[in-house]
């Protein structure tokens, strides 16, 4: 089966082609440089760029995959969560293709796509497993059983990625904040500041990062000279400690031997390294996708569509910016 994946939920325009589980092409056009001067994604600008970028990205994806339009068997598109204008661009394009080619259409939850991205690297992955889903807009611990996804815990305020962006702004760094903090943190002392770890010792699996962000702000206000590298490193350590403590706690509590990372923040090398250290210590299998499958891409939407397609087409898909699992 040839599956076309389309992803336009935020500021990446992405199209991928899969033959069953094999990637034939995966093309991503990023808008980071467009939004950098605004310090974050501007929804209207994002939608307009998707409109102009999507036809080009689509053409490149087909060309790289060496297929024609008529070779497509299934169209898989993100329908939420995300920016409504951005989502509508991808959905409208996918619906038009579905009608023109008379090929089935399936809508995919963006978060589910991040989970299924792991199947691109680990095709033999079998439930049950625990997922740390951590991105700019979402931070959740998920329990995967067969095709059922149970949310064990989630952030009660800021997502981890949001906290990175906000602390980066406090430090006067660029956008996106996560990579900027990671970049300077490698030159800092991660024990220079003992920032709080909200909910670290709570019995549940929920997160809270707004207090940590505020603690960073108050700490900086008290300093005459801001050691940015040390602040970034200490903040990164605090976030990582919280995320991994809760994730591996969930795995042990549920007696599950496999932990999977997913989402854009899972591209953070410090997080990946610490997760590997803990997994070895605890004797738990850790699976981490390559960085290109952590950040937004359409291959994850295509693989999710391939695995979840039940033979029925859904042309009634609508953009759901606040879609939950």
From Swiss-Prot:
It is an enzyme of class 2 (transferase). One of its GO terms (cellular component) is cytoplasm. Its EC number is 2.3.1.234. GO terms for biological process: tRNA threonylcarbamoyladenosine modification. Gene3D superfamilies: 3.30.420.40. Its cofactor is Fe(2+). Substrate binds at residues 133-137, 165, 178, 268. Fe cation binds at residues 110, 114, 296. It holds the Pfam family TsaD. It comes from the Bacteria. The keyword Protein transport does not apply. PROSITE patterns: GLYCOPROTEASE. It is found in: Cytoplasm. Binds 1 Fe(2+) ion per subunit. One of its GO terms (molecular function) is N(6)-L-threonylcarbamoyladenine synthase activity. PANTHER family: TRNA N6-ADENOSINE THREONYLCARBAMOYLTRANSFERASE, TRNA N6-ADENOSINE THREONYLCARBAMOYLTRANSFERASE, MITOCHONDRIAL. Required for the formation of a threonylcarbamoyl group on adenosine at position 37 (t(6)A37) in tRNAs that read codons beginning with adenine. Is involved in the transfer of the threonylcarbamoyl moiety of threonylcarbamoyl-AMP (TC-AMP) to the N6 group of A37, together with TsaE and TsaB. TsaD likely plays a direct catalytic role in this reaction. Belongs to the KAE1 / TsaD family. This is tRNA N6-adenosine threonylcarbamoyltransferase.
């Amino acid at each position: 089966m040839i599956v076309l994946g389309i992803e336009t939920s935020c500021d990446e325009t992405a199209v991928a082609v899969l033959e069953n589980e094999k990637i034939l092409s995966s093309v991503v056009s990023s808008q980071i440089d467009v939004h950098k001067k605004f310090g974050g994604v501007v929804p209207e600008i994002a939608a307009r760029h998707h409109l102009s970028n999507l036809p080009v990205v689509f053409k490149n994806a087909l060309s790289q995959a060496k297929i024609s339009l008529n070779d497509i068997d299934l169209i898989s598109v993100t329908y939420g969560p995300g920016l409504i204008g951005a989502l509508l661009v991808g959905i409208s394009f996918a619906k038009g293709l579905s009608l023109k080619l008379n090929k089935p259409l399936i809508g995919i939850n963006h978060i589910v796509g991040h989970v299924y991205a792991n199947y691109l690297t680990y095709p033999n992955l079998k439930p049950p497993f625990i997922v740390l889903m951590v991105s700019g807009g979402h931070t959740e611990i998920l329990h995967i059983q067969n095709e059922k996804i149970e949310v064990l815990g989630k952030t009660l305020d800021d997502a981890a990625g949001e906290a990175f962006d906000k602390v980066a702004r406090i430090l006067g760094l660029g956008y996106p904040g996560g990579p900027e903090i990671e970049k300077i943190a490698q030159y800092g002392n991660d024990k220079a500041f003992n920032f709080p770890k909200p909910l670290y010792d709570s019995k549940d699996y929920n997160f809270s990062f707004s207090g940590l962000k505020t603690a960073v702000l108050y700490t900086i206000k008290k300093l005459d000279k801001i050691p940015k590298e040390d602040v970034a490193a200490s903040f990164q350590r605090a976030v990582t400690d919280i995320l991994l403590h809760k994730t591996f706690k969930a795995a042990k509590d549920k007696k599950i031997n496999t932990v999977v990372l997913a989402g854009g923040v899972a591209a953070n090398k410090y997080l990946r390294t610490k997760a590997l250290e803990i997994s070895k210590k605890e004797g738990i299998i850790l699976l981490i996708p390559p960085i290109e499958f952590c950040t937004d891409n359409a291959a994850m939407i295509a693989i999710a569509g391939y695995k979840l397609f039940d033979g029925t087409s859904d042309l009634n898909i609508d953009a759901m910016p606040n879609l939950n699992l």
